[in-house]
């Protein structure tokens, strides 16, 4: 059993035994800043490049149908909607916030942000700094040893993107310590890389770590001149791991309009 698996097993056992004092193995510190509301945000109008607004009917959509849709959402007890924005032909035809959430503030994007990490990897490939067939262990060459060279010899960048790495170290394992890259590279495999699908957010985290390893910049810093600034995306926040690496697969807070801009790219 790998060190990470042993650490997780120990943590679970201590919780069962009610030995919870100093049980954590990960250094925690608050990260998320207060959301920058209002007109006072520096350069907001000039930098954020808001999408054009339009009356629904001018884009072939009935306002009455949209109003009925919003009412159904508000009355549906099993749906906890925070905000909704409808974009048609590149124009915003509806935006709504459901109490107590005001329209226009950021929200956790969960796994939607994996697509943004994928964009960054595509940019890195376009710049000639990475290839889909590159081996993960070669990117992190300073961490090579006899064990992980053998175990991870077939795991490629493409396997991380399409969730076929088969690496066992997943989100559960991050409670075992601060160095998540080490935990991933020391992990075993639960299948055949490139053949077996296993959804694992740590694959996307490792893509983010690759960007830092190759460029010396965090994923957030790397995307700033390539994506955030050109698209006017300013009010955004992405959590980092204890080592300062952007999480990549989760932890992104983004405004609905900015998420819509990214969706329009495809």
Where are the predicted features?
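Active-site-proximal alpha-helical segments within enzyme catalytic domains
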Residues: 203-210, 250-266
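N-terminal leader/targeting segments and the immediately adjacent pre-domain N-terminus
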Residues: 1-102, 126-130
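Flexible glycine/proline-enriched surface loops and loop-helix/loop-strand junctions
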Residues: 102, 187-193, 203-205, 241-248
